[in-house]
From Swiss-Prot:
Chain positions found as N6-malonyllysine: K429
Region Disordered, annotated ranges: 216-258
Organism this protein belongs to: Sus scrofa
GO biological process: translational elongation
Subunit note: EF-1 is composed of four subunits: alpha, beta, delta, and gamma.
Biased composition (Basic and acidic residues): 216-249
Domain GST N-terminal: 1-82
Protein name: Elongation factor 1-gamma
Length: 432
């Protein structure tokens, strides 16, 4: 796969290959591939007449360009759509990404990266278009985990990659909060192992990036100026460091300017620990998790928990899904729980939970018992943790009460009468 580094269009094929098992070797740097040079050579143009990247060459000599075509080629039947109807819907969303998302996303994001001039009216129009797109997706995803069917397809891969720079660069919390279903789906996808293997850890935008006129000016190629005679007195009088700086500034911006900018943006400082302000606690959650994972729950893990639990440094909470009437198939309800856990991945060091699905198809409920660092709900501490929690009611538990003792025992062991539920245990999920 010929491409330049951090090309979001190439990500589509690489993520698809993670799902299908296709072995793809990436050539994105000299001497194998130099963007702006290699793709203009006669040899490259014989294989790929458009001279565009990404471009794919198979071991058997098969060549194809255009990112959607490459992603389709390296996919399997499940990703492409296993029925004619599903396949048509996949093509629908892939086309939608190109026609409805790429244009406004480019108009809005590119100026903030310093690679396109800013036009206020065009940017405002682009923002409106992005709102429309996110709203359309939000309505579609209200009752769906993924865009087509119950598993990831090329539709999800393509639309996620197309939205990637919007979420990283300009969709700050206040803008994206109006689209909870789209946010939930996006976070579910990027936290799948196959996505993470290609994208790494995606940091969502915290403050909308703005156009920087200076950055834009610096990114433009400089006009040629008359060369001074070698060894001129004026040149010799300047300090060596200053001459180097002038030489560096005079160099034209490389054709890969977008990619260098993307890489710089990706190299962001590590986020602060949202729990750093809390005093140290004697309760070591990781040790309890080891007991819970490796020892008997009732005879070892629970006694350890109550013996070491620090009620001042930690708190217990009972949660219940607000909309049980919307729960239909049990496997879809389980997807709600799993998706929430995936989106809370960074919370694992400071939380533990047992969440249970009760009942059967079209008659079920979800509730759980959570352990959090501190005395308040942890979700408001990070925008990334706020996607799901408002879909649940939360009640703080008294560690000393008999009710809490019963809830912790039943939910942590997955055994008991669950008299407060009124439905039979179906299955449970552990967040640890």
């Amino acid at each position: 796969l010929y491409t330049y580094p951090e090309n979001w269009r190439a990500f589509k094929a690489l993520i698809a290959a993670q799902y299908s098992g296709a072995q793809v070797r990436v050539l994105s740097a000299p001497p194998h591939f130099h963007f702006g040079q290699t793709n203009h050579t006669p040899e490259f143009l014989r294989k790929f007449p458009a001279g565009k990247v990404p471009a794919f060459e198979g071991d058997d000599g098969f060549c194809v360009f255009e990112s959607n075509a490459i992603a389709y080629y390296v996919s399997n039947e499940e990703l492409r759509g296993s029925t004619p109807e599903a396949a048509a819907q996949v093509v629908q969303w892939v086309s939608f990404a190109d026609s409805d998302i790429v244009p406004p996303a480019s108009t809005w994001v590119f100026p903030t990266l310093g690679i396109m001039h800013y036009n206020k009216q065009a940017t405002e129009n682009a923002k409106d278009e992005v709102r429309r797109v996110l709203g359309l997706l939000d309505a579609h995803l209200k009752t769906r985990t993924f865009l087509v069917g119950e598993r990831v397809t090329l539709a999800d891969i393509t639309v996620v990659c197309t939205l990637l720079w919007l979420y990283k660069q300009v969709l700050e919390p206040s803008f994206r909060q109006a689209f909870p279903n789209t946010n939930r789906w996006f976070l579910t996808c990027i936290n799948q192992p196959q996505f993470r293997a290609v994208l790494g850890e995606v940091k969502l935008c915290e403050k909308m990036a703005q156009f920087d006129a200076k950055k834009f000016a610096e990114s433009q190629p400089k006009k040629d100026t008359p060369r001074k005679e070698k060894g001129s007195r004026e040149e010799k009088q300047k300090p060596q460091a200053e001459r180097k700086e002038e030489k560096k500034a005079a160099a034209p911006a490389p054709e890969e300017e977008l990619d260098e900018c993307e890489q710089a943006l990706a190299a962001e400082p590590k986020a602060k620990d949202p729990f750093a302000h809390l005093p140290k606690s004697t309760f070591v959650l990781d040790e309890f998790k080891r007991k819970y994972s490796n020892e008997d729950t009732l005879s070892v893990a629970l006694p350890y928990f109550w013996e070491h639990f620090d009620k001042d440094g930690w708190s217990l909470w009972y949660s219940e899904y607000r909309f049980p009437e919307e729960l239909t198939q049990t496997f879809m309800s389980c997807n709600l729980i799993t998706g929430m856990f995936q989106r809370l991945d960074k919370l694992r060091k400071n939380a533990f939970a047992s969440v249970i699905l009760f009942g059967t198809n079209n008659s079920s409920s979800i509730s759980g018992v959570w352990v959090f660092r501190g005395q308040e709900l942890a979700f408001p501490l990070s925008p990334d943790w706020q996607v799901d929690y408002e879909s649940y009611t939360w009640r703080k538990l008294d560690p000393g009460s008999e009710e809490t003792q019963t809830l912790v025992r039943e939910y942590f062991s997955w055994e008991g009468a669950y008299q407060h539920v009124g439905k039979a245990f179906n299955q449970g999920k552990i967040f640890k």
